[in-house]
């Protein structure tokens, strides 16, 4: 999961990895990959100032935290890629997990890995029905790498969860181990939105135009379903492709490579998604009903296949993009609606996996990008995800390792300087 290290396996990046491996084999003391990448400077839009924010450590000792949610009682729930939902109570990370999903999942590699327990979402009426939803990677039949499973669980009256009580909502067949998407969020309409990557592999070599443009697969899409039913799910009649022959009716938007993280603006309901690029470009999109975001015809705003002269008719372009001279894997975040950081009010916060945090400002004519500098945070951390609490404050989920083997993950809250 940790994202698109492997999926955006650029030759330059791989050469760095090979160099690191050689040095390690020689027994030399080296500072790993993050030190190399951290020397790359971001290039925000001219005229936008850098904004500084402090961070407050909420918890460390986590195995690659992939998502966070807030059940309303003061606790914090965190998903670890390895398969646990952990609870932070009164500032302390409890030893016993709320839920252990390892028996349902594939075995997660300790090094670089994109599969695992990837996200959690509370039902809009969680206060009353105590239902929540998870996205995890499960074993698959022969010919597939795994399945991306969305499942429902429910707290008991004692506040516990039976690991065998899960109800599977849907399963996505995954041909390879990367580009899994894996984000789930409820929209203001009460429906569950699910992101799915293109199925993995360099350049989405699944047919002439790839899975992203194939409307008869869930891969490379954002899906929208109604989970308020006793079995499976229902397809909302307002989905854009309902009734169209050869189109999966669950599709809300398409043309994605790996929309690893998306979120809704708490105030407006607008849907933002970061889509991880292939070799050259990272992008952020505003997701609209039925829209085509172009992969693998384009990468960002640039022709990908063919490399020149591609037909961009009908493609919705990103609101921002940046090159691999700056980063390697976009991590979608949230529109800031809290009170701790007035300078960020109404701006979209996101990051790159290598650790640079950004904001987007809507000028009315265009979205402009600026840098966010996080103070009192350890150097060379990888950003895995963001979270948002009930008050609209934003959290940054990080890891000091390249994978989930060691408990070097942490959650930080962005706070006033």
Q: In which residue ranges do the predicted regions lie?
A:
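Acidic, glycine-rich loop-and-beta core segments that form the ion-binding/anion-interacting portion
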Residues: 240, 249-289
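Acidic, Gly/Ser/Thr-rich repeat motifs that build Ca2+-stabilized beta-propeller blades
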Residues: 41-198, 261-264, 269-277, 326-364, ...
């Amino acid at each position: 999961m940790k994202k698109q290290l492997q999926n955006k396996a650029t030759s330059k990046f791989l050469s760095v990895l090979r160099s690191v491996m050689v040095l390690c084999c020689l027994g030399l003391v080296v500072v790993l990959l993050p030190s190399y990448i951290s020397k790359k400077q971001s290039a925000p839009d001219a005229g936008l100032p850098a904004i500084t924010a402090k961070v407050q450590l909420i918890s460390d000792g986590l195995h690659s935290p992939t998502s966070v949610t807030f059940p309303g009682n003061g606790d914090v729930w965190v998903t670890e890629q390895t398969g646990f939902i952990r609870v932070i109570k009164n500032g302390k990370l409890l030893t016993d997990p709320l839920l252990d999903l390892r028996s349902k999942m594939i075995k997660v590699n300790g090094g670089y890995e994109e599969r695992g327990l990837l996200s959690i979402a509370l039902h809009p009426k969680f206060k009353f029905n105590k239902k929540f939803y998870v996205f995890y990677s499960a074993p698959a039949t022969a010919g597939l790498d795994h399945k991306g499973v969305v499942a429902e669980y429910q707290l008991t009256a004692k506040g516990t969860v039976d690991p065998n009580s899960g109800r599977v909502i849907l399963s996505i067949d995954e041909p390879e181990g990367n580009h899994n998407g894996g984000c789930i969020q409820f929209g203001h309409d009460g429906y569950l939105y699910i992101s799915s990557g293109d199925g993995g592999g360099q350049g989405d070599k699944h047919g002439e135009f790839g899975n992203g443009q194939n409307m008869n697969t869930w891969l490379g899409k954002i899906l929208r379903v109604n989970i308020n039913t006793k079995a499976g799910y229902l397809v909302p009649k307002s989905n854009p492709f309902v009734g169209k022959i050869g189109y999966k009716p669950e599709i809300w938007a398409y043309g994605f490579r790996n929309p690893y993280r998306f979120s809704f603006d708490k105030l407006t309901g607008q849907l933002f998604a970061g889509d991880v690029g292939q070799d050259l470009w990272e992008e952020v999109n505003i997701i609209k009903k039925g829209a085509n975001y172009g992969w693998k015809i384009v990468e960002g705003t640039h022709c990908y296949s063919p490399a020149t002269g591609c037909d961009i008719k009908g493609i919705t372009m990103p609101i921002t993009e940046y090159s691999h001279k700056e980063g390697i894997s976009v991590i979608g975040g949230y529109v800031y609606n809290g009170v701790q950081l007035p300078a960020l009010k109404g701006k979209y916060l996101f990051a790159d996996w290598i650790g640079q945090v950004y904001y987007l400002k809507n000028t009315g004519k265009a979205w402009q990008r600026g840098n966010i500098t996080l103070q009192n945070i350890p150097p060379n951390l990888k950003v895995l995800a963001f979270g948002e609490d009930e008050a609209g404050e934003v959290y940054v989920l990080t890891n000091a390792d390249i994978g989930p083997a060691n408990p070097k993950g942490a959650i930080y809250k962005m706070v006033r300087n």
